[in-house]
């Protein structure tokens, strides 16, 4: 490098390259610096043109001189140095020129004999064969495929694997796999010059994980890794011809019983079917209610207080049957899923019934359900008092004239479900009894109460509650423009007016619930209750009948003195209305399937509730007293129990009231209508005052 450039030029070049002078001769470093400085000094980049030219000159000169210095000296000569051929100078020059060449360097100019000139023996001789390269196997032997998993791309995890590789790599992998995966068993088997490694791991792994680990140790050698589906059958095949065992981690190898699972202890499972049957029998549609009710069955029957009281038929009737299953259910981790399936079964059965059963059959089934409940709570094990429910019958019968006919006509309306003649309207002021009667009818027939006072955008899911229901009640509908300023305004009447297709029942409508698909069906019939709001004509045309309620002071006082009616919700119970129908209506008005049961209940009412007792109940109601405050008197005549019409019963009550409650004053005795608690308050009087004499 010292002969390439002089000292001044080399120092100048190093300064231009921006390198230390000690780096002179480091050609790669100088090359990088040169390229970097070209970008810096280039005129197009805003650099110094003079420095660029000077650096290029010095660097090119250095490169040229370095190439010349590294070229070997072959003793070249020019044509002017060679003397003329044939002269003595040329002979001497030729001799001196050849002195440097090796004497052994000699080329024979004689040609070898060609293939055609070869002897006959050489033509027919067999040339030596080249050794063929043995191809690596592409898969396990075919007789082992039935024991191996053929999945290529799978996330399935296994605990048994087989590795097919060369004998040399198998010796290495045998130890590496044992250390890496802490195998429970591993063996190496000979297979056609190669080895198969069979091993079991304590934990499950993917085949790809085993393959990736082995592939690191088999760069050039072939490697095939697969999972094993039939562990013992594969191991047994590898120990027989044409395979044989080379080594294994357990002396004596594996036995068949090593792979047979131990017989676990028989664990009792929850009977989903039993829970579903309970939900269907009780018609439970609430998941959490079913969950809570069934968990109560886990306690001992003999110590159960509910069974001792026998006031809940859905408990004491089924406790003993479901006791064993409830104990297992209490320890289950999927209690909600079991109850959800049971509730879905109840809803599915209801949908099938609405599709295949007539409305009369559905109402008959509902009456049977109520009669079953009455048999329980009024039976030997029940704790309900029949007289209290008959007191509710007497109170409801005083609410409206011919109450039994009102209920009968309403049932006739919703059973036949005639389009545009399906809804009733209960209208009246506060505390007039419209909601009490509506709640009783709803419990008698089965259905849901809906709130239409919501904004229209929220009304969609509220109407979805009516899916597969027998009837609905639009409760306490609010409107605008009421005469009384005390009544709040609302959107209920406007919303009902927008739901004419729902009320008419001529076409099917779409009902939807959250997390459920839309259900297309005829909207169920029912009734509407409201205060004294004006009703538009378009909505009034949808009501087949309107009943106007008026508050009655004697009913309110009697209800206040008979608290058991409110505490036990007797007036809102469907059983009370059914008892009212049994008491007043003839047997022929009921469905044929339940007439025998109706006769039994009529006979029981004959024996337990006399006509005098029922008339005394109505008298106490008219006087505002406690309904069951009855002074029993023995009658000489045999009393006939309540098979009479409502008009006769009410007439008797009216006559008793007028006879026993006459005040001492002459003016009140002559005009019973002046009494505050007279029976005619609120409806037509059946005992009219005497006609005054002509003037």
Swiss-Prot record:
Superkingdom of the organism of origin: Viruses
Sites of Phosphoserine modification: 114, 122, 125
Cofactor: Mg(2+)
Modification type N6-acetyllysine: residues: 687
UniProt KW keywords: Acetylation, Activator, ATP-binding, DNA replication, DNA-binding, Early protein, G1/S host cell cycle checkpoint dysregulation by virus, Glycoprotein, Helicase, Host nucleus, Host-virus interaction, Hydrolase, Inhibition of host innate immune response by virus, Inhibition of host interferon signaling pathway by virus, Inhibition of host JAK1 by virus, Interferon antiviral system evasion, Isomerase, Magnesium, Metal-binding, Modulation of host cell cycle by virus, Nucleotide-binding, Oncogene, Phosphoprotein, Transcription, Transcription regulation, Viral immunoevasion, Zinc, Zinc-finger
Motif stretch (Nuclear localization signal): 127-134
Residue numbers binding ATP: 428-435
Domain SF3 helicase per the UniProt entry, residue ranges: 402-562
BP terms from Gene Ontology: DNA replication; symbiont-mediated perturbation of host cell cycle G1/S transition checkpoint; symbiont-mediated suppression of host innate immune response; symbiont-mediated suppression of host JAK-STAT cascade via inhibition of JAK1 activity; symbiont-mediated suppression of host type I interferon-mediated signaling pathway
Domain J: 12-75
GO molecular-function term, one example from the UniProt record: DNA replication origin binding
Protein name: Large T antigen
């Amino acid at each position: 490098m010292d002969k390439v450039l002089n000292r001044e030029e080399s120092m100048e070049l190093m300064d231009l390259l921006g390198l230390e002078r000690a780096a002179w001769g480091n050609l790669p470093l100088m090359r990088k610096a040169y390229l970097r400085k070209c970008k810096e000094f280039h005129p197009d980049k805003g650099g110094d043109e003079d420095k660029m030219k000077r650096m290029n000159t010095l660097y090119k000169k250095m490169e040229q001189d370095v190439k010349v210095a590294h070229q070997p000296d072959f003793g070249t000569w020019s044509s002017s140095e060679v003397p003329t051929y044939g002269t003595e100078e040329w002979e001497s020059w030729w001799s001196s020129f050849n002195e440097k060449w090796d004497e052994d360097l000699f080329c024979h100019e004689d040609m070898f004999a060609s293939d055609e000139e070869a002897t006959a023996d050489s033509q027919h001789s067999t040339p030596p064969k080249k050794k063929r390269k043995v191809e690596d196997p592409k898969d396990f032997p075919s007789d082992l495929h039935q024991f191996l998993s053929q999945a290529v791309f799978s996330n399935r995890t296994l605990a048994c694997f087989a590795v097919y590789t060369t004998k040399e790599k198998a010796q290495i992998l045998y130890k590496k796999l044992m250390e890496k995966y802490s195998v429970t068993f591993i063996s190496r088997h000979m297979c056609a010059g190669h080895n198969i490694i069979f091993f079991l791991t304590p934990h499950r792994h993917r085949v790809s994980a085993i393959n990736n680990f082995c592939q690191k140790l088999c760069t050039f050698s072939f490697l095939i890794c697969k999972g094993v589906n039939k562990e013992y059958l594969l191991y047994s095949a590898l120990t027989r011809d044409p395979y044989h065992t080379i080594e294994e981690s357990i002396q004596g190898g594996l036995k068949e019983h090593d792979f047979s699972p131990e017989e676990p202890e028989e664990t009792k499972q929850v009977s989903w079917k039993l829970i579903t049957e309970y939900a269907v029998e009780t018609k439970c549609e609430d998941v959490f209610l079913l969950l809570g009710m069934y968990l109560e069955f886990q306690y001992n029957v003999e110590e159960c207080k509910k069974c001792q009281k026998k006031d809940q038929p859905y408990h004491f009737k089924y406790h003993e049957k479901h006791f064993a299953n409830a104990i297992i259910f209490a320890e289950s981790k999927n209690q909600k899923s079991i109850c959800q399936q049971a509730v879905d079964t109840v809803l599915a059965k209801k949908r099938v019934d609405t599709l295949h059963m007539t409305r009369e059959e559905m109402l008959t089934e509902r009456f049977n359900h109520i009669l079953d409940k009455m048999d329980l709570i009024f039976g030997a094990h029940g704790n309900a008092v029949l007289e209290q429910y008959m007191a509710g019958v007497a109170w409801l019968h005083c609410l409206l004239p011919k109450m039994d006919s009102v209920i009968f006509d309403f049932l006739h309306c919703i059973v036949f479900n005639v389009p545009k003649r399906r809804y009733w309207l209960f209208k009246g002021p506060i505390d007039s009894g419209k909601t009490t009667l509506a709640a009783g009818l709803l419990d008698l027939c089965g259905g849901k109460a809906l709130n239409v006072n919501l904004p229209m955008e929220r009304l969609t899911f509220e109407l979805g509650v009516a899916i597969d229901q027998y009837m609905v009640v639009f409760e306490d509908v609010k409107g605008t423009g009421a005469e009384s300023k005390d009544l709040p305004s609302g959107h209920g009447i406007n919303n009902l007016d927008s739901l004419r297709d729902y009320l008419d029942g001529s076409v099917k409508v779409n009902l939807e619930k959250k997390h459920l698909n839309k259900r297309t069906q005829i909207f169920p019939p029912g009734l509407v209750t409201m205060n004294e709001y004006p009703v538009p004509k378009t909505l009034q045309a949808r009501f087949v009948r309107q009943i106007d309620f008026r508050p009655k002071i004697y009913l309110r006082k009697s209800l206040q003195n008979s608290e058991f009616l409110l505490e036990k919700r007797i007036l809102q119970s469907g059983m009370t209305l059914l008892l009212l129908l049994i008491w007043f209506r003839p047997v022929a008005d009921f469905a044929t399937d339940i007439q025998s049961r109706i006769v039994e209940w009529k006979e029981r009412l004959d024996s337990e509730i006399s006509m005098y007792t029922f008339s005394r109940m109505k008298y106490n109601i008219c006087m505002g007293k406690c309904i069951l405050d009855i002074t029993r008197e023995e009658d000489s005549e045999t009393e006939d129990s309540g098979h009479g019409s409502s008009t006769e019963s009410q007439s008797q009550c009216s006559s008793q009231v007028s006879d026993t409650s006459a005040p001492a004053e002459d003016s009140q005795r002559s005009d019973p209508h002046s009494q505050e608690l007279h029976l005619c308050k609120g409806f037509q009087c059946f005992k009219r005052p005497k006609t005054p004499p002509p003037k």
